[in-house]
């Protein structure tokens, strides 16, 4: 149904009226927040002026405590009021820019007049008229917008079910107090591009196509049964858009038990995280947690290794280890490349995961490796002594539990060592270097030991013993800290042991079928470990082994994980994520045709990823219609990818792609420069030159910069370790 000019004018007028009322409320609230803030500052400033402190008698003490409590309660009330008013003010400031995004007209059964209900991120009441101008998207009546098309509808309220008829469903895109898009629809459209299509077109066939696309996406958005939902979709089919709408829907439907910080999105790269934070529907909530898999690896392993990122690995694979870019090819270089490729395949597979699980079982009986406990270049406990102690425990005790027992034993051994070490000459030398503050703290401890009696350092032996313990405690602190973090376990040695010919474990039982170039794989792995470098294909197996031995740091608070571009994850990585989040559901979005890491992808077949939760708990949804590119582009690209005939193009016309073959790089660069100049003349503000590899991009930048008058952008976006890999928990791990 096409909107009339009269309807459009009425909606524009309403937006103006509503935003004006919100602006008035913002002004009032800003004044209120300012006054309350002044109250808080004044109360804090004169807090003790208003409190009478007299502890001379028990009665006076009680009155003093009551006076303090009363003043504290006044301060707490003002602070609560300030926090709540500031929170409301923040919502109103967002609301005034984009007051609502939906409208439904509803006639309750038995009534004659229809009610227009506008939905936004928060409710807004016109206090003079006593009427809600905007309803919160979480209000009971809002479910009509998400769950129904126009027609017979019903929604649940605390007082029972309300039935009636929805006569209109209208969607808006309002920014900066102006309506950008507006259209009537039968289904709720969440994708921005589809909104634009519906807003600009009155063609019935186009509306039918868009409605069909949204219904397909709704199967993804509203799926609430599958433990693992796999979405296989062509490029531009709206997988990510559907996933973001799915987040919105799940937060809405389970708003009483699911919050945004219990959802995690693993996105392809840090730039995508910024994009996602701007596209989530207007929920009035914080965004869900977002990270990249690389950032998580950096967070967990960055202190131990220089961790290779996936793009560096990919660059190596695509350039054949540099063989494709001018290097003189030799049989040794070719073999090195093939060996690395074989290692990537092998270490990314579930077969290698099974080997590590078997290796863990073997370590319960034999093969554990430990670092000796050292202090000031002195070996306190040898690695052999630690191995002996470890295998003295009951073999039925799990590895992580045995290590906890080892930790407690080691801390006890350090206490015994300290009693002997206290007599060493270096301790007296350190005592001489103690500051007056450290002497004073030791004196305070002595008073506590003496039960509060006034004491002095008259006894030299007592003084020396107390100060020596202070010195030893400080110097042993790093050793104790390392023990508490289980750093006495030689994890690098344990992982490397898998690749050593002579090892304390029987690898014949573990690795029955060795991959090609096994000897070269072993040599390269050990060499990288010795240099404190961890290739990307080793990062997840190393982390998995570390957690299998020391105890998994599972995150039980997260309830839903969304993996975008899942085709770029290996089977091993997906299995690790399942182990990391044991109580969550998972949504995996990907496209077999877009697997940039096809040498190690779980999406090379659907079966490995579907096997994570089993067929009973897994559902696969396939999207075939690509609507983000023109028909001509889709028809061109579907001729390149396997099974491309199944991809359906959208009815958007455009120019045909051109394939130009040149005889040499010089001709290529001249043609590119001419094409860029033409596009700039036509007014294009942003032009991208896409290459297969980073080295090709570097080459293109060097060649094109002298040929172009306009500046050619050049930026790198490396992975950043640290906070990016942290995943918050509502409850302790």
Predicted feature residues:
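Short hydrophobic beta-strand that contains or immediately precedes a catalytic carboxylate
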Residues: 213, 562-563
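Short, charged/polar micro-motifs that form catalytic or ligand-binding hotspots
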Residues: 90, 94, 199, 203, ...
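Conserved helicase motor core of SF1/SF2 NTP-dependent helicases
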Residues: 278, 282-286, 291-295, 302-316, ...
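Extended, charged low-complexity regulatory segments
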Residues: 1-210, 214, 218-219
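Conserved motor-region signature of P-loop NTPase helicases/translocases
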Residues: 118, 123, 165-268, 272-278, ...
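Short, flexible loop/turn elements at secondary-structure junctions
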Residues: 108, 235, 267-270, 567, ...
């Amino acid at each position: 149904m096409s909107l009339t000019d009269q309807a459009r004018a009425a909606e524009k007028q309403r937006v103006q009226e509503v935003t004006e009322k919100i602006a008035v409320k913002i002004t009032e609230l800003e004044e209120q927040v300012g006054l309350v803030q002044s109250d808080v500052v004044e109360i804090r400033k004169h807090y003790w002026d208003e409190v009478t402190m007299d502890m001379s008698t028990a009665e006076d003490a009680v009155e003093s405590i009551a006076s303090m409590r009363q003043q504290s309660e006044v301060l707490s009330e003002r602070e609560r009021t300030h926090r709540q008013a500031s929170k409301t003010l923040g919502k109103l400031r967002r609301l005034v820019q984009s007051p609502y995004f939906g409208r439904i007209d509803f006639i309750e059964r038995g009534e004659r007049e229809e009610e227009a209900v506008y939905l936004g991120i928060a409710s807004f009441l016109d206090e003079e008229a006593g009427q809600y101008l905007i309803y919160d998207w979480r209000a009971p009546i809002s479910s009509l917008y998400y769950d129904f098309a126009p027609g017979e509808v019903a929604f649940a309220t605390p007082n029972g079910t309300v039935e009636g008829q929805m006569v209109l469903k209208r969607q808006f895109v309002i920014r900066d107090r102006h309506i950008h898009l507006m259209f009537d629809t039968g289904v709720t459209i969440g994708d921005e591009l589809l909104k634009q299509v519906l807003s600009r077109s009155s063609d019935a066939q186009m509306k039918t196509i868009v409605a069909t696309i949204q219904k397909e996406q709704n199967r993804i958005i509203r799926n609430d049964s599958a433990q693992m939902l796999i979405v296989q979709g062509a490029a531009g089919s709206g997988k990510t858009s559907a996933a973001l709408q799915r987040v919105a829907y799940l937060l809405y439907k389970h708003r009483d038990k699911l919050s945004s910080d219990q959802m995690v999105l693993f996105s392809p790269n840090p730039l995508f995280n910024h994009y996602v934070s701007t596209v989530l529907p207007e929920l009035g909530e914080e965004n869900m947690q977002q990270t990249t898999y690389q950032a998580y690896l950096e967070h967990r392993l960055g202190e131990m290794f220089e961790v290779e990122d996936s793009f560096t690995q990919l660059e190596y694979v695509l350039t054949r280890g540099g063989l494709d870019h001018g290097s003189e090819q030799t049989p040794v270089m070719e073999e090195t490349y093939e060996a690395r490729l074989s290692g990537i395949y092998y270490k990314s597979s579930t077969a290698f995961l099974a080997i590590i699980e078997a290796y863990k079982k073997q370590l319960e009986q034999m093969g554990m490796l430990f670092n000796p406990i050292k202090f000031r270049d002195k070996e306190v406990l040898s690695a052999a002594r630690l191995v002996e102690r470890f295998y003295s425990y009951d073999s039925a005790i799990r590895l992580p539990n045995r290590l906890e027992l080892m930790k407690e034993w080691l801390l006890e051994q350090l206490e015994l060592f300290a009693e002997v070490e206290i007599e060493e000459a270096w301790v007296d030398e350190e005592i001489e270097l103690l500051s007056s503050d450290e002497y004073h703290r030791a004196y305070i401890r002595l008073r506590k030991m003496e039960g509060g009696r006034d004491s002095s350092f008259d006894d030299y032996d007592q003084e020396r013993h107390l100060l020596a313990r202070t010195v030893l405690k400080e110097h042993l602190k790093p050793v104790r800290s390392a023990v508490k973090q289980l750093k006495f376990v030689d994890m690098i040695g344990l992982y490397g042991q898998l690749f050593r010919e002579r090892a304390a474990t029987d690898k014949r039982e573990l690795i029955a079928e060795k991959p090609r170039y096994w000897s070269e794989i072993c040599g390269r792995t050990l060499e990288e470990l010795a240099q404190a470098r961890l290739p990307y294909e080793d990062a997840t197996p190393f982390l998995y082994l570390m957690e299998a031995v020391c105890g998994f740091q599972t995150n039980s608070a997260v309830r839903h994980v969304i993996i975008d571009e899942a085709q770029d994850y290996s089977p091993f990585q997906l299995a690790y994520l399942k182990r990391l989040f044991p109580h969550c559901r998972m949504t995996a979005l990907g496209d077999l045709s877009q697997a940039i890491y096809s040498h190690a992808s779980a999406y090379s077949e659907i079966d490995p990823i579907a096997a994570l939760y089993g067929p009973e708990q897994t559902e696969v949804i396939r999207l075939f219609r690509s609507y983000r590119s023109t028909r001509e582009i889709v028809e061109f690209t579907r001729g390149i990818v396997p099974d491309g005939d199944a991809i359906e193009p959208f009815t958007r016309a455009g120019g045909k792609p051109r394939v130009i073959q040149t005889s040499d790089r010089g001709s290529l660069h001249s043609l590119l420069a001419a094409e860029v100049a033409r596009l700039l003349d036509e007014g294009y503000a942003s032009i991208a030159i896409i290459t297969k590899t980073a080295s090709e991009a570097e080459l293109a930048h060097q060649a094109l910069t002298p040929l172009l008058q306009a500046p050619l952008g050049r930026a790198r976006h490396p992975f950043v370790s640290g906070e990016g890999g942290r995943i918050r928990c509502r409850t302790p791990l």
